């Protein structure tokens, strides 16, 4: 006889509490083929009862066996009788997390694009559990938007909503919207100049046609662009679409109780506003040369008016945000008044004890800045300039007060790639109630600077560390940084920081580190190894655990090596041009990484031969295809370099009048170039054979253009340049 199961909620339960009940109902069907009934009568007879709701609800307090004090994120799972389990939370979101925690204990694992169910969950039962969970990392943020073809550029609104829902199961409680300043997020006008430009993907056209490998995965798309933007041409059209799109994301996130922030790019403007700047940047400060910033007096009236307009447009168009971020452009040029700015800051905030010259010296000499010492000094000085500017700007404009009226908290960030020395004093010079965050291009780069985090007093700042589970500078290569993330979170927790913010691009590779982050956010004793063993055991089977842990170790080493030079396969137009023009084969570091990918592929093949769970084959094939993509991409770069050597030899032979030798080397160059292009085609072909999620679609479209279409053109142009007469 079927067992009767009820899920009891309060008659006045909030929508999210009821959602928690329907989620539990759905999982019970999928796991045990049990069709539970949702009821508001907690005393109704049943073979098994789940009491679901907020702490303080009468039915929870009656059944809970003494529900403990719970924070807004705290949740409790307690079997209080043979036939009764209580799932309670300090907020509606936490009630959902109690349900998801129970479902995980039934054997389900949450991936960022799907759920994985156990092959056999066994008979229905109430789990023997009595646990109260409170967060170790109170703020757990994921960037939802990355204006990049291998990130979410190719995702529909529904794709984003599905991603948010999976993050919620992993107990993420905050989301950040982070479009580039060139995107049509806001509309504004200053002194008769109206914003008229806005572009997605930095206006990089990566066309899609019938020649594209993997065309069958790309629908009717004509370029790598979010489906909702197909056909939009004018700024007003794009702005209306993006605004609707962003509000769709915000509404869905908030329906789950997720806190939403947005980066405002308050000191970076579309180029039509250059005439208003006293000394505008004239060299490109970001991809596409679509934006500019002020190099002169930051407090000149027109610059103040522009910054004000950016703030006010965000408050008017996105007034339902919880946080709004401000700061500097990624590539900052606001250093011109550094000395005067520092003098004002020193007086205003009592910073006379800070050795600014010593910090400048460390900035110049650390060698830890991508872009070199010149960038490091320029951006450190620019950060000092921005602290002074925002202090004066907020005092003059009242923007902070208007943000407070809307319940929006200000957030300021610091790029630790270049300005980490400012952590020695920044906590003393921030606007009141401002949250602070730091970032860098890779987790391993942040770990190199942990000692600087120790210098900052976190009191009142609720600081978070922004890091990556993968970095777009390394392109669409498999990346793992779990051990570095572990070191980082252990340090920030010890120092009293509030949490972390993650950036992602493609999502197919990130489940292992995400599993770690989800567990470590609630368990200070969680380690990468322990989480890996649980994760791989449930996804692939026990025999696969040890070799897959070794795979993660090798990939993490490869990621750390790649984080030093950055940029091998950065998904931007022309990225392969320098490889076409190179006259050297792969360097030792790249060869080392390529060999690591080959070893990982071999290890994955052995895992498959030893046998995995019945539902694991496609995931294992996906990982193998990611290795093959990377191996072929590095092979292409190596062959292009060898082709460049052969072209150089051919040119030298012709210069000395040896046409036979010239033709011999030209033939070698053609062979290398042909093989290089075939390697690029092979890379995209294998990726197209294992498409798992929306970011894969963007990846195969973008890298067909970069590794095949553009390389073909670059080779022809380079050969014609060296041998204009043939």
Q: Where do the PLM segments sit?
A:
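Active-site clefts of carbohydrate-active enzymes
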Residues: 332, 452-484
